Structures are given as structure tokens and as C-alpha cells.
Amino acid sequence: MFKLELQTRRNFLTATTLGLTFTGIASAQTAPTTIRIPIAPRRQWDERNGYCGECSIQQAALYFGTYVSQYVCRAIINTNQQSQLLVAVNAQKVLTALKLNSTEFNYNGYASPQFQTYFGWVKQHLKLLHPVLITAFVKGLSDPDYDHIMLATGITASNFTTYNSTDQLYFNDFFSSQVSLRTASTLNDIRSMLINGAKYPFCIPTKICYGCAVLGIQDISARALPVSITLGNWTEPNVIAGVAPSTLSASVSVNGLVVGKSYSLFRYNDYRKVSTANYTASAYSTIRNFVASGTWPTSLKTSYPMA
């Protein structure tokens, strides 16, 4: 985990173990606009009912400067790895433990069918560059609520307030190394999966919808700058399947730097030690002090081994 502070934000790497209130945001536009959050797809582990929720949070956390393995994500809620990470059940508990703010779709606050209202909610968060954990039915499965969790990372739309059948949603499904793209009218179905589900493997429930938007890091100091992490491989050693842990490589990017100003980049090797203020007095693992120069006037990129 990394934080770089203006002499800061956080950059969190924990690889050793391998909100916003929904108020409506009007932004009518005459031509479609595309907003993409640069989050690369990652492969989920399939064992023990699947690690899709853990993989969702892992990807969103990377965008905000935090790396945790899928194992660590699940261990936050269940140390024996038997309980799933689920939206509307325990996803926010994990995000809070990682010092990330989040908000969930209020599925109790809207009449059924909810899909169009839900899709408008997702659009509003994507406009604010908040990745969204979305839930889906999977053809051939039978859970009445949802079977799978994915991460919405972008939208093409002419407005960012309400549903439009021609909108396009970008999302990571955790099985493909490529970002998926679907038109809004093809995204939803009921449990039988006989309409859109006849063509597509994943569909958002039409009637009752569940989602969780990740808003960003907890930063009481209000001094942290945007840090993101990119991993060198889209998979990680599946220790649940008996694969031995290995060292991962990561690139850390910091944006919003001002030439001539001093900064400190903090690394935390344990998510439980990440601070939300007074970073210089926190239990960080390493610190890198630097002055922004013309070499990287607005951003810093560096690499770290992650064991």
C-alpha cells in the first residue's frame, strides 16, 4: 500500500501473505462521451465458490494505490477462507479494513424492476471515476440474488444520470484478460437467463440489483495525491490450489505533482498499519522523499518487487 503526501499519498503493497451519498448528478450531453478508469483485468481464483468478490476489490484497490492478494481479501472476513466476499453482505467490511471509502446501491429503496435505476447509479459513479462492483446472474446457476461479481470500469453515454438503451458499459469479468464491453440493452435478464442470457454468460438482474462503488482512500489529512499500482502479470499464484507464492513486480504511479515541491511516498507492508493522517509518524515500511522536477512534472513512476 502506498501513500504520497505533500512532503504524501498512500501506496499500499501487502503482498507478504501470498460515502458518497446517492444524490444524483446531472450532466446532460448531446453526443456520447466515453469515460474509462484505467484498471487492467485480473484473473480470479475459482476454488471455494470463487474469489470474484475478492478479485473485484483487489482491482479497485490497485487503482487507489493498494495491493492485497485475493487470499488476504477473504482472510479479512474469514481466516479459514471458507466464506465468500459478497456485495450487500461483507464487501464494505473488507473495503473499510483496507482504508477505502465505499457506498452501496440502496436496493431496499427502489421498486422492482430496478435495473434502469441501478444502471443510472452505476453511470454516475463511473463519471466520478469510482469503480463499481456489479453483480450478475450466470447461465446454468441458480442463486436467487446473483452468482457472480464483476468490476465496472467505464461507460459510453450521452448523459450520466439516467439509463439509455444505447449506453455501453466497460467491465472486467475476471475470466478474460481483455476488458468486456456490452450495450446497456443487452446487460440485464431475469433468473431464467432466456433473453439476453441466451447470448451472454453474465447478466445483471432485472428485478433486484446489488452494487458497491469504491470512492477512494480514507485521508483525514486531505493531503494525499492519487497513487495507482499496475502489476506485471494479470494473474497471481493461486495458493488455494497449492501453487507456491512468488514475487510479483509492480509499477507505482503518482499524479498531480507540482514541479519544485517536496513529496514523500510511503509504503505499508500490512494493511492494518495504513494511516489516514500524520503519515510521517505512522508505521510505514519504507519512505521515499523526492522533489518533483521537470523529468516528471505531473507524475512519478517507479517499480517495486512484491514478495
Name every feature range the model reports, one short phrase each.
Residues 1-7, 11, 15-22, 26:
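N-terminal secretory signal peptides
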Residues 30-39, 71-221:
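Conserved active-site-adjacent core of cysteine acyl-enzyme catalytic domains
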Residues 35-80:
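Active-site nucleophile-adjacent alpha helix/oxyanion-hole segment immediately C-terminal to the catalytic cysteine
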Residues 214-243:
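Short, compositionally biased P/S/T/A/G/V-rich stretches that sit at domain boundaries
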Residues 246-252:
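Structural beta-strand segments of beta-rich domains
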Residues 257-261:
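Short proline/glycine-enriched turn/loop motifs at strand-loop junctions of beta-rich domains
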Residues 264-266:
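Beta-strand signatures of extracellular beta-sandwich domains
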Residues 286-307:
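C-terminal beta-strand-rich structural cap/linker in extracellular carbohydrate-active enzymes
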